[in-house]
């Protein structure tokens, strides 16, 4: 068993110790990992929101713009592909595309291969805004991980990938 110094203890260690005292009949070991993941997720969410706000973007706007950016030149996708990439409904995606178009971040054009369809693409403004926000986000994420060396980051990424695999598998 690992003995921790007071400096190495964190709020989760105190939480786990309290539950072990109050409910010794329960295995509270999952809290060691998942409470820390939950706390980190809150810090990441704050970092993401700060990066996006600095570039006048909402999280949902960033999600749509990055889906287009990752598509590569000409940074263009169908609304159906966008909704699958962002896991929202058709009505929600239509509303989001409308709002992004009004803001001058995306444009629509007829799909030359499907007369009934449209394609959505980044404008120059959308491209520069998403690129700047993404660079800022990565800077903040590097700060969040600064307590871990590169090897530990790779190990953690591998463990988290294993943990997430059942949830990310196609149904």
List each model region and its residues.
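Short amphipathic alpha-helical elements of helix-turn-helix/winged-helix folds
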Residues: 67-71, 159, 166
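Charged, amphipathic alpha-helical coiled-coil/dimerization segments
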Residues: 98-158
